[in-house]
Amino acid sequence: MPRVKGGTVTRARRKKTIKLAKGYFGAKHTLYKVAKQQVMKSGQYAFRDRRQRKRDFRKLWITRINAAARQHDMSYSRLMNGLKKADININRKMLSEVAISDEKAFAELVSKAKEALK
């Protein structure tokens, strides 16, 4: 039986890796061995940072809510506690958007939270 080297399959696989490495600097986008390593590392970064992004956005929303709450003489933790006691269910993403875009509505939420804390 003749030897089968699988040239087209190997070429296609390598071509796919090089295509994934498009935009990388230096040898990382031209040489297969280096490109393969970088594509694998990039995949690890992407996996990790998809989770990190969720944490980063939550931190951003909390920072924005805290800044807006302090303009109304209230801390973030007291505001969230007051909203929970007032039975106002609004998530941090929406609350930060309200704090940025609609100052009157946010002031109303703060006043309801203050009433619930009394």
UniProtKB/Swiss-Prot annotation:
It comes from Staphylococcus haemolyticus (strain JCSC1435). Belongs to the bacterial ribosomal protein bL20 family. HAMAP family: Ribosomal_bL20 (MF_00382). PROSITE patterns: RIBOSOMAL_L20. NCBIfam families: rplT_bact. Coiled coil: none annotated. The keyword Zinc-finger does not apply. Gene3D superfamilies: 6.10.160.10, Ribosomal protein L20. This is Large ribosomal subunit protein bL20. GO terms for biological process: ribosomal large subunit assembly; translation. Binds directly to 23S ribosomal RNA and is necessary for the in vitro assembly process of the 50S ribosomal subunit. It is not involved in the protein synthesizing functions of that subunit. InterPro entries: Ribosomal_bL20, RIBOSOMAL_L20_CS, Ribosomal_protein_bL20_C. GO terms for cellular component: ribonucleoprotein complex; ribosome. Keywords: Ribonucleoprotein, Ribosomal protein, RNA-binding, rRNA-binding. One of its GO terms (molecular function) is structural constituent of ribosome.
